[in-house]
Amino acid sequence: MNDAIGRIIAGESPVFLLIAGPNGASKSTYTATRLTPIGFPSVDPDKVALEMLGRHPKTREEALTATIESTRRVRHNFTERRSIALESVFSDTKGHKLALLNEAKTQGFKTALIFVGVDTPEICIARVMDRVDRGGHDVPDELIRSRFPRCFENLKAALEIVDLAVLIDNSGCYGVDGGRKPRDSDDGRGFGFFLPDVFSLTS
């Protein structure tokens, strides 16, 4: 785990941790390998959908129902002043996740963003195809492509809100471009090393 994230989690204030990034960027892998082993609670809308439906959503309405329930669970933790993480593709156009970050700050939570990014939507599409081959859920290619730039636009806005942000370049995972391992970084303020590339992708 990034040292800065470890420090904020170990602090006295409750923490709202948003794990964001495009489809197939390995957000759930981050949760499973970094947060679950230390007992940090998290909400994954995909898992919530499985709990509610017994399968992955097939319609927009079903996906929205899982999203609403996920938000309800996060807000319950806000009320109880308990730390919580939420996974998100971070592509909504109405700013709901940004509003959650602001809501958490208003209620005295520390806010942290883990952004798991990749270079292109084609990497996301390849990852999702691999996930489907292994029994995971599918996401249409065009939906992945349309979400990709919105995800980075929301990242820009989130960086103005959160107390800490760490950006993870996961483009090389699974050997997509030569087998590089995922990298994460922060510069003391918590802003990741590939931030200039983020802005160039959305400018």
Language-model-detected regions and their locations in the chain:
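Conserved GTP-binding G-domain of TRAFAC-class P-loop NTPases and closely related GTPase folds
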Residues: A10, P14, A126-S203
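Short, hinge-like loop/turn segments at secondary-structure boundaries
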Residues: T59-E62, A104, M129-V132
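Conserved nucleotide-binding/hydrolysis micro-motifs of P-loop NTPases
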Residues: K47-A49, S91, G117-I123, G172-Y174
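Conserved substrate/cofactor phosphate-moiety recognition/catalytic segment
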Residues: T29-R82, G95
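Conserved beta-strand scaffold positions in the cores of enzyme catalytic domains, especially
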Residues: F40-S42, T111-L113, A165-L167
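Glycine-rich phosphate-binding loop used to anchor ATP phosphates in small-molecule kinases
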Residues: T65-F115, C151
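Pre-Walker A adenine-sensing motif
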Residues: M1-A10
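Glycine-rich phosphate-binding P-loop
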Residues: F16-L35
